[in-house]
Curated annotation (Swiss-Prot):
UniProt keyword annotations, A-Z: ATP-binding, Late protein, mRNA processing, Nucleotide-binding, Transcription, Transferase, Virion
GO BP annotations listed: mRNA processing
Annotated GO MF terms: ATP binding; poly(A) RNA polymerase activity
The protein's name in its UniProt record: Putative poly(A) polymerase catalytic subunit
Pfam families per the UniProt record, alphabetical: Poly_A_pol_cat
Function noted in UniProt: Polymerase that creates the 3'-poly(A) tail of mRNA's.
Catalyzed reactions per annotation: RNA(n) + ATP = RNA(n)-3'-adenine ribonucleotide + diphosphate
Induction info: Expressed in the late phase of the viral replicative cycle.
Amino acid sequence: MSSLPKTDFNVSKYQLIAQKREANAVEIEAALEVVREFIIKKKLILYGGIAIDYALHLKGSSIYPEGERPDFDMFSPNHVEDAYELADILYEKGFKQVGTVRAIHVQTMRVRTDFVWVADLSYMPPNIFDTIPTLTYKNLKIIHPDYQRAGLHLAFCFPFDNPPREDVFSRFKKDLQRYNLIEKYYPIPVVPVKTTYESKTFSVPFKQVAIHGFAAYALLYQTLNELRITCKAPEWKTEFPQPSYSYHKNDKNITLTVDMPRAYPSLVLATYNPEEVIKEMGLHLTEICEPYMDYSPPIFKTKDIHFFSTMFKELAISMIQDNIIVVSPQYLLLYFLYGAFATPADKSLFLFYYNATLWILEKADSLLNMIQKQTSPEEFTRFANTSPFVLTTRVLSCSQERCTFSPAYRISLANDVQQSQLPLPKTHFLSNFLPDISTLPYNYYPGKGKDRPTNFSYEKNLLFNIGGKCIPFAM
């Protein structure tokens, strides 16, 4: 019986061939060249896969095959007007079926021609846009890989985001490969920072919160050290911080005593319902901070404890001894990157802790390899599944249905409510959480003869308050 001939399953190769043979390939390439010139003229900043690819090109590497059609994702401090302007330019140059529509991600506008997407423009507040680090590749500004890391960590922090193509299925492998390339070609230098500590004691709920920030680092470091002792591995010599902690617990609360940097003595907790937790703990709000892009959620500050809100999200968590809930190492890495971006005066401190957390994961990986060689596959799988140092799908779930509905879903529901002209019942769990879609950007189609929408206001829509601004809370 004859066998079938071997087939070359080079997917990228055939994708390139398919692109070149599309009926409108010439028009698409011409439209993309218009987009490229627009990006350069407006000094917009590329991000996402194309920015990673271009940054790697500067180092002699890449993630995309040579000649692949560019997928232009860009940041703009005025993305709505820029998207409308780009649509007008394409239409005036004779391209057909030009349109600008609001994307599923509410802060993004998509531009298409002939039903092919040629540009995604995402909003970045001016205070961030004007200060983030960039590189230049062929006259195009691209976001620096240090900043790009944050977006890669994000998928690991919220594994069930973006249904029905949840990140755990659609992004984990791809983002891990991209992260490793960034770490290889653009490592963040280890610059030791002398830090003075003070011992702080906090009492927090046992079940509703995950320990975060510098306290989470202390817990993960000591958990690593206990694993080293269990494995009878020699003690490591390191310049990274080695804070200690102790605790005792009852059915409801944990009393935690932990070494905290004197410059940042407040405990940081992640919770899906910060206002209720603050009320239950008898604390008083002093300040509320808006999100910092997608990289830091709303923060509710009290005198000694800061609460990171994960409402409408399912945050990946780790469990350490006695089932103490700690954020995953990936969320901790994201926290330290956010700190470096948002507080330039202490950038070196946060990046030092970022590298320290990477070191913890590196050492944990070496210990897990040691355990794997000494145990059966079944025993190792059980052990690894409970390790706080591996990627996980264990999440801090909200007991209320409303806590797992994304902004995109709520906007879609608000659209349905508007079209039906029937309000949601007041008893509906989302009745108080529907956005005012009348303040969102409008779609625009230059060829339909209607005037371009004007006067979009970022200030009037809470969904665009993502610059990290903090406002004192009036009692």
